[in-house]
Amino acid sequence: MAAKIIDGKTIAQQVRSEVAQKVQARIAAGLRAPGLAVVLVGSNPASQIYVASKRKACEEVGFVSRSYDLPETTSEAELLELIDTLNADNTIDGILVQLPLPAGIDNVKVLERIHPDKDVDGFHPYNVGRLCQRAPRLRPCTPRGIVTLLERYNIDTFGLNAVVIGASNIVGRPMSMELLLAGCTTTVTHRFTKNLRHHVENADLLIVAVGKPGFIPGDWIKEGAIVIDVGINRLENGKVVGDVVFEDAAKRASYITPVPGGVGPMTVATLIENTLQACVEYHDPQDE
């Protein structure tokens, strides 16, 4: 079989258009536009590209985008002070600190300093805990974006045997929680997993997030499986590929995400959704 391509670019554009319409309706009703503060410390080239795409997406949907580009020499105390200021700013609904941070700054301390109601990346322990307890508020962007893709393609996940490859805090772990909520029987594999091939071959829904080009051979894929490739790897020849050998996997899967143009655009679209949610649910004046 030839797999159907899950077009993340198109779905992400739909999500962004929906958010833009809601923002226009807010402004027409006399409410303020949502505000997102994006903080970049240092000059990591990859981080600069990610940050630029997030800021552009913000402006496209009509958000107020605030940029804070701090030098590499910024101290942890200075960064925490900025976060405190943004936490107290009523015009800011979301605070995004681009990772990785320079050496000497504690990622965990910084992420925990962001108020949970402004944590639009969904990384704060409070928000992760809410997801674990089946009462999610702001959800980690990549896992939530993947669930949106599955929903928009009307893929019924209940009862599927789902396998997540990679147990990172950003994708793998929260993804496993989203899949449990979506009714899957969920396995998470990691570097200590024995016989990885066995797990892959039994997956109805496979989500791969390890950051290694071609890590999963196409002939491991179960016939008719749904394959979600989160990896974004740039080869020496400049080509961008995923963690799955796409051409071979696409011959066996029923659905597959391409790289680029699959999961990546959904991460930014979900960040935009989260910022609107934070604005409407947590920061708008609530009717008594």
UniProtKB/Swiss-Prot annotation:
Pathway: One-carbon metabolism; tetrahydrofolate interconversion. One of its GO terms (cellular component) is cytosol. It comes from the Bacteria. Its EC number is 1.5.1.5, 3.5.4.9. It catalyses: (6R)-5,10-methylene-5,6,7,8-tetrahydrofolate + NADP(+) = (6R)-5,10-methenyltetrahydrofolate + NADPH; (6R)-5,10-methenyltetrahydrofolate + H2O = (6R)-10-formyltetrahydrofolate + H(+). Pfam families: THF_DHG_CYH, THF_DHG_CYH_C. Catalyzes the oxidation of 5,10-methylenetetrahydrofolate to 5,10-methenyltetrahydrofolate and then the hydrolysis of 5,10-methenyltetrahydrofolate to 10-formyltetrahydrofolate. This enzyme is specific for NADP. Belongs to the tetrahydrofolate dehydrogenase/cyclohydrolase family. PANTHER family: C-1-TETRAHYDROFOLATE SYNTHASE, CYTOPLASMIC, C-1-TETRAHYDROFOLATE SYNTHASE, CYTOPLASMIC-RELATED. This is Bifunctional protein FolD.
